[in-house]
Amino acid sequence: MANTLFPIFLKLDQLNTLVVGGGNVALEKVSAILRNSPEARVTMVATFFREDTLEYIEKFPLVSYEIREFLEGDLDGRDLVVCATDNVPLHQKIKAIAAERHLLCNVADTPDLCDFYLGSIVQKGDLKIAISTNGKSPTLAKRIRAFLEEVIPTDIQETMDGLEAYRNSLKGDFEAKIKALNEITKGLTFKK
C-alpha cells in the first residue's frame, strides 16, 4: 500500500496542544514539538511526571502542566492531542472523545489510532524536511534523518537567502518567475 499521508507544517504557536503523559514517551513527544516550535502552546496532564520531563518543559514559558488524571474537559479549546502514557484504555477513550470533537490525535506507538504522526525532522536554518515511513519504522526515519543531516551543506541558509533575494527581485508574471527560478536552481540537483 502506498503512503497516502499528506505532509503539512503547522504553526503550533497559533494552536493549542494537549499532551497526556509525563514519562519518557511524553518527554520524547513534547521535546519533538518544542524543538521545532519553541513558541508552541502546550498543556501537559499526567498523574506522574518524571523529573527530567519537568526540568525540560520548565524552560518553555508557554508550556503548562497539571499533575492529575485526564478529564474530558482537558480537550476544551484544543486543536491537537498527543496521548503518551502506557495506559491503552485511556488512549482509546481520549481518541474517541477527540474524534467526536474533530480534534486531531496522535497516540504513541499505536498507528491505527493516529490521525497524524510526528515525523523525523531535519533542520538546517530555514530548511526543514519531515520524514515519514507511514508509521512502519521510526528507526529507519531516524537513520535517513542522520544521513540528510550529513549531506545537506552547512551553508544552505546562505543559498536560501540568496534565492529569496533573487525571487523578490524578479519582475513579470508568475510563470516567468518560476522559469527564472528553475533556471538558476537547476545546478542544485544531485545526479549520479
Stretches found by the model and what they are:
Residues G135-K192:
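An accessory alpha-helical subdomain
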